[in-house]
């Protein structure tokens, strides 16, 4: 019986995948590297660890550090974030699941301060029991952050499902012992996600059917 829902943020509840694609191309063009011609190609390519994805795109990190590249991404992301919205149904679904008695937290690779600021900006304050971001914006340590929280709070992995949009979310779920559901409208394509062998949804509203009416 599922009682706990761990949400990924970027690409799952927040519809920011297209600006990630745009930022990737801005940064590639600045460096004279080949840009990604199609949005769907980006969704086939994107992966974790993010530093490896940068290397796949052609970054060498000989004249700049990963930290410098990550800082530039965060700056561009902050400028473009006002053009983003929540995923269709995000507020409706999280409100309904909260009212049904599900315990909900967010586990994100985003820095803690950035995550908290984004939650406020999009009117999601108070929706979740805990916001678990990272110490910085380098996109490391998501699984360990989740594992520590679950141990501290006595959250039973067998009663927990992680909802995310990447194969990395699946890997995190495996490492913390939780179930996993993936949404195919985020940073990775359905083709990539199908390799994980877990349920895949297209709309967040499908979760209202998947999860029971009330937590028992």
Stretch-by-stretch model annotation:
Residues 78-106, 116, 143:
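Short, acidic loop-to-helix structural element flanking the phosphoryl-transfer center
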Residues 12, 108-110:
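Conserved phosphate-coupling serine/threonine residues in phosphotransfer and NTP-handling enzymes
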Residues 100-102, 153-159, 214-215:
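Glycine-rich phosphate-binding loop signature in dinucleotide/nucleotide-binding domains
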Residues 34, 124-129, 156, 201:
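Conserved H-loop
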Residues 2-88, 92:
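N-terminal helical cap/lid subdomain that shapes the substrate entry/recognition surface
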Residues 161-200:
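Acidic, Mg2+-coordinating phosphoryl-transfer loop and its flanking beta/alpha structural elements
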Residues 42, 124-140:
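A short, structured active-site edge motif that brings together acidic residues
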Residues 4, 142-171:
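Conserved Lys-Pro-Asp/Glu-containing loop-to-beta segment of HAD-superfamily phosphomonoesterases
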């Amino acid at each position: 019986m599922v009682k706990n829902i761990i949400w990924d943020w970027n690409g799952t509840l927040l519809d920011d995948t297209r600006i990630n694609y745009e930022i990737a191309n801005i940064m590639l063009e600045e460096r004279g590297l080949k840009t990604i011609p199609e949005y769907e190609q980006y969704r086939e390519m994107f992966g974790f660890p993010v530093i490896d994805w940068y290397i796949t795109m052609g970054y060498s990190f000989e004249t700049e550090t990963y930290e410098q590249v990550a800082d530039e991404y965060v700056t561009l992301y902050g400028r473009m974030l006002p053009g983003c919205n929540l995923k269709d149904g995000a507020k409706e679904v999280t409100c309904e699941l909260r009212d049904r008695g599900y315990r909900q937290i967010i586990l994100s690779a985003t820095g803690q301060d950035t995550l908290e600021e984004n939650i406020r900006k999009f009117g999601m304050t108070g929706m979740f029991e805990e916001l678990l971001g990272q110490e910085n914006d380098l996109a490391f340590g998501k699984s360990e952050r989740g594992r520590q929280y679950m141990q501290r709070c006595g959250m039973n992995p067998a009663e927990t499902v992680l909802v995310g949009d990447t194969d990395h979310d699946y890997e995190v779920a495996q490492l913390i012992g939780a179930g996993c559901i993936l949404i195919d409208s985020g940073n990775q394509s359905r083709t990539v996600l199908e390799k994980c062998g877990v349920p895949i949804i297209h709309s967040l509203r499908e979760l209202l059917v998947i999860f029971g009416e009330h937590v028992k």
